[in-house]
Every structure is written in structure tokens, then in C-alpha cells.
């Protein structure tokens, strides 16, 4: 056992990747975190090996968010077996620090609800943008969810393009490139990735700002692809763990 400090285990199961982190109950920085590809056929034995790194911590709380519903029972059983606690799951009766209408409450993914929760902890007027398998954004006005926008992710689109273009199949694309203008096919693709990231954030922010001209609108950017965002027209915060933190906040709001 690491110490007597209580920890919360937070699980975010995405379509492509699963991220698991632990936090001290009273802190917002992750103590330990693991990331691995989501496997719809995973089992208790496999998960137990992955999460064994957390056994040394005094884990007394847990929340599991998932956009892959079939995996929830496996995670429930694994966490209960390893830590002797029952994880909390988001449901239609879950309370939030923001207002959400009935329809989006039923349809919006757990991860985006967690992003909303983190956003309103920063400011009552806020947009959150997640760059991952999908590009997703949420807009909150006066602590109320106005709406969201979802598009195919950069990695998915790039992989499909490389599959179709024979000249690109042996080329290495640097998704971390910050160049705005490409001088050949590869650097042009790298420029496109950079401009798509920054352009999506810029446009979504501006549309929200038009709807809320007199507010101090904040912008939170997160997700595995949230790097090299080049925007000078407004301030933004990049927090890779915003969604995990949102789940943590949801847990303690409901328990």
C-alpha cells in the first residue's frame, strides 16, 4: 500500500483508446496514468494485469465512463475484484454542475459530459474541444449546455488517405509538425493536420463568441491529438486530463 491517502480510480473507455488515471481525493493532478488500445473482447485477467500498477495505492473510489457499453460489466467486475469497491457509472439520473436537456442527456457520450463538467469548473461560459479519434466540441453558456459538434478525427482521416494513396504508404507523417505551408506532399499533409486542428478550434470559438458577445468565454482543449494548436486571436488552456478530471468531479458530486 502506497500510503493512507485516499485515491480515486478514473476510467475513460473510448472507441480507440482507454485511459485510466488515479487522483488523490483532494488534488487535480494525476498520480499515475496508463493508456492502451480499447479491446472490445478484453477480460478480467487482461485488465487485472494492466491495472496491477495501481494496487499499491489506497483506492477507495472509482468512476467508469464508456462509449463502449459492452465493456462496462468487465470493468465493474475487475475493479470490484481488485480494490473491493463498486465503480460509479454515469446514468440518466446523474447530477452535473451544468444544465443539460433530456435529449442530449440520453445521447451525449460520457466523455463529453465529463468535458462539460470540467469546463464549467473553469468558467460558466466555456467551450471544450477534444482532439482524438473524433474531434468533438461542447459549448456551455451560463452553466448550461448549448450544444456540441463532432467530426471524424484527424488520425482516422489521415490513415484512410494513406491507404488510398500508394505514394504515401511508405512515408512518415509528422503529426507534431507546426508548419503552416507545405513544400511537398508530405509537408503539405502535415500542414493540413495543423490547420485542421487550429481551424476547428478557431471557428467553433468564434461561433460561440457570436452567441455570447458580452461574456468572458474560456476555451479548454484536450485529447491525444491536442498539440501544436496555433491560435493567436484568443486564449485557451490545454489540459490533457480535462476529461478524467471531469469524471472525478462528477463522481464526488454524486457520492
Swiss-Prot record:
One Pfam family hit: Pan_kinase
Subcellular location: Cytoplasm
Reactions performed catalytically: (R)-pantothenate + ATP = (R)-4'-phosphopantothenate + ADP + H(+)
Amino-acid positions noted as binding substrate in the UniProt annotation, renumbered to this chain: 109-112, 185
Any one GO CC term of the record: cytoplasm
Cofactor requirements of the protein: NH4(+); K(+)
Catalytic residues of the enzyme: 111 (proton acceptor)
Alphabetically ordered keywords of this record: ATP-binding, Coenzyme A biosynthesis, Cytoplasm, Kinase, Nucleotide-binding, Potassium, Transferase
Binding site for ATP: 12-19, 133
Coiled coil: none
Entry note: cofactor: A monovalent cation. Ammonium or potassium.
Gene Ontology molecular function, alphabetical: ATP binding; pantothenate kinase activity
Enzyme Commission number: 2.7.1.33
Its job: Catalyzes the phosphorylation of pantothenate (Pan), the first step in CoA biosynthesis.
Subunit structure: Homodimer.
Stored PANTHER family: TYPE III PANTOTHENATE KINASE
Family classification: Belongs to the type III pantothenate kinase family.
Name of the featured protein: Type III pantothenate kinase
Organism: Malacoplasma penetrans (strain HF-2)
Amino acid at each position: 500500500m502506497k500510503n493512507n491517502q485516499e485515491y480515486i480510480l478514473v476510467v475513460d473507455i473510448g472507441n480507440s483508446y482507454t485511459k485510466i488515471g488515479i487522483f488523490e481525493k483532494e488534488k487535480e493532478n494525476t498520480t499515475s496514468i496508463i493508456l492502451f488500445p480499447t479491446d472490445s473482447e478484453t477480460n478480467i485477467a487482461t485488465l487485472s494485469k494492466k491495472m496491477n500498477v495501481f494496487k499499491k495505492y489506497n483506492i477507495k473510489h472509482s468512476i467508469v465512463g464508456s462509449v463502449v457499453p459492452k465493456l462496462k460489466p468487465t470493468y465493474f467486475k475487475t475493479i470490484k475484484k481488485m480494490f473491493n469497491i463498486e465503480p460509479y457509472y454515469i446514468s440518466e439520473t446523474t447530477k452535473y454542475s451544468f444544465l443539460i436537456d433530456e435529449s442530449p442527456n440520453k445521447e451525449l457520450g460520457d466523455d463529453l459530459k465529463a468535458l462539460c463538467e470540467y469546463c464549467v469548473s473553469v468558467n460558466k461560459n466555456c467551450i471544450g474541444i477534444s482532439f482524438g479519434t473524433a474531434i468533438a466540441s461542447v459549448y456551455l453558456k451560463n452553466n448550461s449546455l448549448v450544444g456540441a459538434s463532432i467530426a471524424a478525427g484527424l488520425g482516422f482521416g489521415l490513415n484512410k488517405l494513406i491507404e488510398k494513396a500508394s505514394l504515401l504508404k511508405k512515408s512518415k507523417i509528422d503529426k507534431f509538425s507546426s508548419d503552416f505551408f507545405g513544400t511537398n506532399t508530405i509537408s503539405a499533409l502535415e500542414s493540413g493536420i495543423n490547420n485542421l486542428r487550429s481551424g476547428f478550434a478557431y471557428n467553433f470559438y468564434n461561433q460561440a463568441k457570436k452567441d455570447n458577445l458580452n461574456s468572458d468565454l474560456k476555451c479548454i482543449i484536450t485529447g491525444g491529438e491536442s498539440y501544436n494548436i496555433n491560435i493567436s486571436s484568443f486564449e485557451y488552456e490545454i489540459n490533457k486530463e480535462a476529461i478524467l478530471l471531469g469524471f472525478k468531479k462528477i463522481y464526488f458530486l454524486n457520492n
